[in-house]
UniProtKB/Swiss-Prot annotation:
Keyword Amino-acid biosynthesis assigned: no
Protein name: 4-diphosphocytidyl-2-C-methyl-D-erythritol kinase
Gene name of this polypeptide: ispE
Reactions catalysed, as given in the entry: 4-CDP-2-C-methyl-D-erythritol + ATP = 4-CDP-2-C-methyl-D-erythritol 2-phosphate + ADP + H(+)
A Gene Ontology molecular function term of the record: 4-(cytidine 5'-diphospho)-2-C-methyl-D-erythritol kinase activity
GO biological process annotation, one example: terpenoid biosynthetic process
Binding residue positions for ATP: P94, A95, Q96, A97, G98, M99, G100, G101, G102, S103, S104
Keywords: ATP-binding, Isoprene biosynthesis, Kinase, Nucleotide-binding, Transferase
């Protein structure tokens, strides 16, 4: 096997996002539910026996040292393999959206190279490597919708009685993006949310809680407010995902997207029960 084609890297939505406190080192303590959706980037990876790591963009340009290449190099460093890879990335998930596109690309890269290079690492080992690159990467490696706490390191799959109902969502990405650091450094950010429970979330699901980053984001980026109003005018209840600037709403009825403002992107998405590559790494090392 020398090439892996059409590898999906799905986006996520934060169904709610609360901040319950702050650690002495300054990191915020979060509670959230991460949900996979079928808005995906696509990767194609070819084996390079010379040990080099290269990347080719099909679409919007990315920095040369993006999370895909960093993930590949981190996997090389962790295992000592002398194999390399050429990564072709087809971007579809918007950047600066709060949808985890870069983290998902990195997770798919780790899963694919673990297979292509014949490393045989289990999911726990891959998660350790992923966490060194970004807090959201372990979630995508787990490959299941999850309740997430702490700084992102506590991940509890929502399965069985807590599984998310199958539903359809519309996701809107305004033209403007947002810088995560500017939101978390804002003095007006709510940092004392009451701790939520999984049972409380399960009683309300898509109507539960709020995104405490949203008020700050709306101040920094008025297009977030405009996107929420655009969906509300169509009779849907909208909120922001992650640190924005994308917003989303559960589709309780069909809507038209023909009047989407110039420069915005919108997509109707289904939630996913499992990451398409969820079976590519064993749960135990």
């Amino acid at each position: 096997m020398r090439t892996l084609h059409d590898l999906p890297a799905p986006a996520k939505l934060n169904l709610f996002l609360h901040i319950t406190g702050r650690r002495p080192d300054g990191y915020h303590l979060l509670q959230s539910v991460f949900m996979l959706i079928d808005w995906c980037d696509t990767l194609h990876i070819e084996l390079r026996p010379d040990g080099g790591i290269s990347r080719e963009d099909m679409g919007a340009g990315l920095p040369a040292d993006d999370l895909c290449t960093r993930a590949a190099r981190a996997l090389q460093a962790a295992t000592g393999t002398r194999q390399g890879a050429h990564i072709v990335l087809e971007k579809s998930i918007p950047a600066q959206a709060g949808m985890g596109g870069g983290s998902s690309d990195a997770a798919t890269t780790l899963l694919a190279l673990n297979r292509l290079w014949g490393l045989g690492l289990g999911r726990t080992a891959l998660e350790r490597i992923g966490l060194s690159l970004g807090a959201d990467i372990p979630f995508f490696l787990r490959g299941r919708n999850a309740w997430v706490e702490g700084i992102g390191e506590t991940i509890m799959p929502l399965e069985n009685v807590h599984a998310l109902p199958q539903s359809r969502f519309v996701v809107v990405k305004p033209e403007a993006g947002l810088d995560t650091k500017s939101i978390f450094s804002s003095p007006s950010l709510e940092r004392n949310s009451e701790r939520a429970t999984i049972s409380g979330f399960a009683a309300a699901h898509y109507q539960f809680g709020k995104n405490v980053l949203q008020p700050v984001a709306e101040t920094l980026c008025p297009e977030v407010s405009e996107a929420i109003r655009w969906l509300e005018h169509k009779g849907l209840q909208a909120r922001m995902t992650g640190s924005g600037s994308a917003v989303f709403a559960q589709m309780t009825h069909a809507i038209d997207l023909f009047d989407l403002p110039t420069g915005w992107r919108a997509k109707v998405c289904d939630n996913l029960r499992l990451h398409p590559l969820a079976g590519w790494a064993a749960d135990e090392d």
